[in-house]
Structures are given as structure tokens and as C-alpha cells.
Amino acid sequence: MSAKKKVSSSKAINLGEAKLQASGIDVKLAKQLGLHYLDGQQTQKLHKVFKPLCSLKIDYFDVAGKPLADLPRAKSFYRLRYLETPTDFQSLTDKKPVRYVQEPNTAPVAYYPKNIDWEELVVDADKPLLITEGELKAVKACQEGFPTVGLGGVYNWRSHRLGIEWLPSLGVVTWAKRNVYI
């Protein structure tokens, strides 16, 4: 007997589709891209540090389209984009609420959107490559024909805390003599 997968609430789906549409992303491609709409309960179930808010789960893949881990023998990497604004005590401050989160003690990973064929592109230095902050911006750029690697933040090409000076997931790209736009 197979386990039933819980279906996200209509609220999570509506918020997720609205976010993708606002980013100019074709919502019909969400599943193919590894984007999943989660309700608050599903979000919090992933890890105890996550707030019980609707979110967009962004799965990461290597250049071959296989799930990507941040470190050897680790589980598949993902990040969350909260789709709601927190209403807890901490949210009453003037600080901008955190929108993107990942599990504690995970390393940054390069995001290769699945709407581009990366395997040939990463080894062909004659083809230009773009790098941007944000997975959704990378998806949109690839959707428009601009091969773009996404980073979860402007410094997410390394992790001093984990002793990573250059992400292994970026090491698969032939960088020498390639035009790169950031």
C-alpha cells in the first residue's frame, strides 16, 4: 500500500502561483522545475526552525537534473520562500522579515534551473553564462533564453563557516575564457 502524499491547501497554491506569476514564471512549469507549494503545517514539518507559514519549496538539482546535496552524504538540498508575512512577536520589529530560509548547518549550493539543458552548456566556454541572486530570477532568465545560475545570496558562492572557498556545485562549470555576467 502506498503512502498518500498530503495535498497543499488552496491558500498555499494560490499564494505560490501568485508569487510565480509576479516573477513572470510560467506556473505550469512549477512541478518540472522542482517548485512545490506548501501550507504552514507542511512547511514546519520539514524542520522545527521553519515558521508555520505557506511557502514555496525550491528543490536544487545538479547540471544533469538530479537532486543535489550541499555536502557529501547529505540529503537533497532545498530552500524555502515564505509566501506569507509572519505575525509573531518578532515580526513587530522594524526589521524586514526573512523571506528565504534553509535548514540550519547546510552549505550554500548553486541553483541550476531545470528549464535549461546544463550538461553541454557548463563545459562549452564559448557560451556565455549569467549569475544572479535568487532562484526565481534564475528561473525567469532561463525561461527567457538566458542561461542563468542562481545563488541564494550575494555571498552564497562560498561558506567561510564551513571552510568552503568555492562551491563544488560551481566547480562543474568551465569558467576560463567564458563571458560571465553577474
Regions from the PLM with identified roles:
Residues 45-178:
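Phosphate-handling DNA/RNA-contact segment within nucleic-acid enzymes
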Residues 1-60:
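Short, small/acidic-rich helices and loops at N termini and domain boundaries
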